[in-house]
Structures are given as C-alpha cells and as structure tokens.
Amino acid sequence: MTFEATEYAKSIATKAKEASRALKSLTTLQKNSVLKRVETLLLENETAIIKENQIDLQNGIQKGLSSAMMDRLLLDSKRIQSMAKSIEEIRNLPDPVGEVVRGTILPNGLELLTKRVPIGVVMTIFESRPNVIVDIASLSFKSGNACILRGGSEAYHSNLILSSLFHQAIGESNLPSVTKDVVSFVENTDREAMVPFFQLDDLIDVIVPRGGEALIRFVSENSKIPVIKHDKGVTNLYLSNKAKEDIVLPILINSKVQRPGVCNALENLFIHKDYPHIQTLLSDLQKAGVQVLGDQSTQSIFPNLPLATEADFYTEFLDTRLSVKIVKSVEDAMQNIQNYSSGHTECILSEDESEIQTFRQGLDSAAIFVNCSTRFHDGGEFGLGAEVGISTGKLHVRGPMGLIHLTTTTTYVTGKGQVRG
C-alpha cells in the first residue's frame, strides 16, 4: 500500500464518518425530500446519463465483454425510469430509524427502550451494474447511513454521473451540516487501491461486496472490517416427474433467458429420470436461446449436447449456458444441489407436497422457491423497494438486504437512582 493510497482512503472514510453523524438528525420528511430530488434529476438528465453510459458500452465492446455483461452494463430510458421508480418505492417505505424494537420495565424499575439506529458508514463494492449505485445510495440515505461506493472500471462513467446527481440533490437541499460526503464515490478502480479502506475499522462499520467469487474472496481475506458477503448465484432447479406440465417451460425460460447476466438467473437444472418430456423440453430450451450443456446421463437421452463438466455445475455462467443433469429422485437432486450450491437460490417444480417439504427442509439457502421463477429472488420483488444485494451469509442478514438491514439497535436505559446489588 502506498502512502498516497492510504491517505486517499482515510480522507474519504473520515469525511463519510463525519457526514454520517449529521444524517442522524434528519427527519424522514427531510430524507425523502432529498430522494425525491434525486428521482427528478434522474429523469431530467436521462440524455446525459445515456451518453456517459455509451462510453462505458463502447469500452466494453473493446474489452470483449460478453453479451450478458453488456446487458448488465446497459442504461437505457426504460432502466433509468425503473431506477427512478425504485427511489419512489424507497421513499414510500417506512423509515426504520427510531422504530421501537422492545420496550419494558424491569422488576427493579429500570425502563428499557430498544430502538433501531443507523449502522453508520457502509462501504459497498460492486461490479458492472450502474443501477446498483442508485439503489445503495438511496437505501443508505433513507436509513441514515453514509455510504462509500466503489464500482467496477467497466461502469466508471455511468457511476460517476449517477453519484454526481446525489451530490447535486444534497447540495440543493440546504440541510444543516449535511454534505455530499454522505454519498462518496471512489474513483480509483484499481483493486489493490481498495485494500487501504479495508484497514479502517475505526471509520467504516461494514463492507458489502457484491460480485464474483474472486472479488468476495479478495475482500474477505484483506478486510479488518466485518463483511456481509453477496456472493455468486449458482442457482439450481429440480424438475420433478410430478411437476405441473404447463408451468415448466415458461418458468425455465423466464429463470434462464429473461436476464441471464444476473445472480438469480438459473445455472443448473436437475431433471427426474421419469420426467416424460425430457427431449422436447431440452429442444424447446435450445429454441429459446439456451445453450444446453448435459452430463453423460443427459447426453444418452439427448445426443450431441456439449458435455457439462463437473466444473460447469459449480459455475455462475451469467450467460445463456445451462448445465443439465438427470437424477433418480428428489434426494439425489438435493445431494447435487448441496454439492454445487452457493447458498443463493434453489427451486423445485412439483405438485407432490411430500416432495416439496423434503426439498424445503433439506436445503440451506437464502431462498427456496416452489413452482415459480427464480428471478423473483430480488429486493424489489420482495417488497423491500430495492436491495443493497442478496446476502449469502447467515449473520446479520440473509437474502435481499433492504432498509431495515442497514440498521442496528441502541438500548436506552432510564432509572431513578438504582444501583446494582
């Protein structure tokens, strides 16, 4: 770590810490007013945002990014309007700050009141998707937290203009003591430049990395600060021979094809050996644009498929490839899922309640779906307005991380002279 990199990180984190203290005094109305202005600025600056995004897209073409990665990077009119809608939904959510979690009077007369309070300073590291900066900054601001945002180099120009809109809205608000440092954007995209931030456990309260396996490992191995992991999504689906026929293909196509470059897109499909339409199903998936890879048992039923290797079943493709394996039972499917899963999203298509219960109770992931698309594993779809990400860990939060998960608690104890005996 160079002296310059260390001082750069310390300067940003120190300002964010100071800014977080001022945020605590804001009312819900004041916070929502700033978010409303950001919402308006997004729509007013659509042309400028798309222009900056085009620079990132052109750079992506030169770098040879996959079509799925380019889709993650794209900002068009529809997505900008969706970002504005997301802010509106966050504004309309109840403010968790100040919520009473517990109130009681102890036998000795002490009054205990536990309330939700902001975590403080949240650093989020993310890749590719520039809309993430709007979701995280909005959620952080509404929950009273300062945020430090570090996006990937591929979305640099998009991230820069989006963060500047927050700075403009905050500057126009004239709120006392609230500065643009409540939303800090790290312009240095070199991975090694992140390390100095990871040592500032006296200034940054939590780090939330969302991205590939390499990023998660890098942050976890180098950070002194608590890390909430938003790991890769190796999403698995078990297709039972007892599934309702008319829902199978629409769910599989939606789960895989709608947006293949996101973490809740399907990656592995396990089909019961007695499912009656395996050949037709795989053919229909190919017609829908899915690149089907099959293990040897699948190849014996549907010849000429490319081989799905053992490594493929551990892989978050983030494109149209799909690994397929034929299994003997729900237990066989579960054993495979337990082996390959990243703990993100699992799904079963079946009409057998006993089989469904076995599947639900036997797996351990952030979300388990029954007879619906895996694409619903999303903060917005879960009614959270938006999400910081989808946590694959088990501590503090698991699954979509929304407003309430950006808070902790403080207990206020009031007495009348009591001393402990």
From Swiss-Prot:
GO cellular component: cytoplasm
Catalysed reactions, as listed in the record: L-glutamate 5-semialdehyde + phosphate + NADP(+) = L-glutamyl 5-phosphate + NADPH + H(+)
Function field: Catalyzes the NADPH-dependent reduction of L-glutamate 5-phosphate into L-glutamate 5-semialdehyde and phosphate. The product spontaneously undergoes cyclization to form 1-pyrroline-5-carboxylate.
Protein keywords: Amino-acid biosynthesis, Cytoplasm, NADP, Oxidoreductase, Proline biosynthesis
This enzyme's EC code(s): 1.2.1.41
Disulfide pattern: none
Organism of this sequence: Leptospira biflexa serovar Patoc (strain Patoc 1 / ATCC 23582 / Paris)
Name of the gene: proA
Pathway(s) of this molecule: Amino-acid biosynthesis; L-proline biosynthesis; L-glutamate 5-semialdehyde from L-glutamate: step 2/2
Molecular function as annotated in GO: glutamate-5-semialdehyde dehydrogenase activity; NADP binding
Protein name, as recorded: Gamma-glutamyl phosphate reductase
Similarity annotation: Belongs to the gamma-glutamyl phosphate reductase family.
UniProt superkingdom: Bacteria
Cellular location(s): Cytoplasm
Gene Ontology biological process terms, A to Z: L-proline biosynthetic process
